[in-house]
């Protein structure tokens, strides 16, 4: 299983990729963690805050397409070095940018840097042990470590002085430079990407019901995921339900539970039918989200956060497994599923912001409850269809 680690270059590639993906987790969570401080310091309203969180998702999606095209032209290493420059640059924009344009550009660039790193690391790590789930699960576990570490770091930094959030931005500039150096030192083989057979499989997937069921399930899941991750801390602070430090810690708890949920789902998927597992997780996100937004005490808020994070952890990969057959038959299907589903993570933060501007952050976050209910309906529809059609679920 670990034979590739005997090769010095592959060992370096393994270690460096795991390190930069942990940093990528810090980058991803910094968006929601820093948002309350940025709103206060820059005097921005809920509507604009929702817009810049959405721009992070836009940047992430753009990177998925542009990074792939660029590495085919200039090579994988030069491509990732170019895109990773936006990591440090985005935080410099946050630090020194005093108008909304610079903030919008900063959040967009954090998404670009995150998306490019995600594409690169997943591809390179998979190349070390093709088809081995443990190496990809390990990579995403490192992402979760970075994700729950940043809110804790920010809490410690701002415990005595809220203005210290700006120091966290300077630290992220340094970490961004460190990640660029790690990419520079990576021994990348087969730097040029080979062109794949164009148009293989065609667009026949548009006639397949499972395409729409999988896409719908992922769309509403990503609506809920980015809506909660982007606005959770602001919701707790602005409603007065939790202190600033406790709000940051809740974000860390969410990601600890996502990590635990991913590990458990990977184990249970070999023992429990994925159809049943997906429905259980769908019911879980509905129950625990309703518990979360209706709770006013720390104990029940914590219970809601833990249950929601644990339940949502396996929905994305399990849903993707249902689409394995159509992706194998129509390779282009995955690009369309990913693109359409990702629109959910772009749209929802802005919707929450618009509602919060008019009615308050409470009703804004309550809108996510509608989304998780629709997602549950999509999940049930997907499972019923697959059982009727006798679809084989790829592992």
Task: State each model region's role.
Residues 29, 56-65, 148, 255-263, ...:
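Residue-level signature of mid-helix packing/kink "hotspots" within the transmembrane helices
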Residues 31-32, 209-252, 256-259:
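Extracytoplasmic gate region of multi-pass secondary transporters
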Residues 43, 75, 96-101, 130, ...:
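Helix-breaking motifs and short loop linkers at transmembrane-helix boundaries and internal kinks
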Residues 62-100:
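Conserved MFS/SLC helix-loop-helix module at the cytosolic interface between two early adjacent transmembrane helices
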Residues 63-75, 261-273, 356-357:
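Helix-to-loop junctions at the C-terminal end of transmembrane segments
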Residues 106-141:
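Cytoplasmic helix-loop-helix junction between adjacent transmembrane helices
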Residues 132, 138-188:
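Helix-loop-helix hairpin linking two adjacent transmembrane segments in secondary transporters
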Residues 272-319:
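C-terminal transmembrane helical hairpin of 12-TM major facilitator-type secondary transporters
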